[in-house]
Amino acid sequence: MIVNESKNLSWEGEVRIADSFIKRALGLMFKKPRYALVFILPLETRINASIHGFFMLESIDVIFLDSNFRVVDVTTLKPWRIYIPKARARYIIEGPRGLKESIKPEFGDKIKWFT
């Protein structure tokens, strides 16, 4: 479950943590996203938080958070595209299309997840 605490909205889907190099490298490649994947980055930066849609089968919703779990950017990433967030991020949430519509994240909103 992913919760926008600022708006009291939630997405009830499954959440997994990309807690290894391999999981972070593969992300949602070669998969139809049916769950959200949370990336915990070692540093809060823009470049290290950049993402790509190489080998992805569908577009995904992506939410970038700072070290205080506040939204710094939101996008929908199409397959075969590259995206660099507008601000430094420490956490990235990749999920199926519809995630954004469920929790309506905007700059500054506080987001939490539960596995």
Curated annotation (Swiss-Prot):
Pfam families: DUF192. Signal peptide: none annotated. It comes from the Archaea. InterPro entries: DUF192, Saro_0823-like_sf, UPF0127. Belongs to the UPF0127 family. This is UPF0127 protein PH1112.
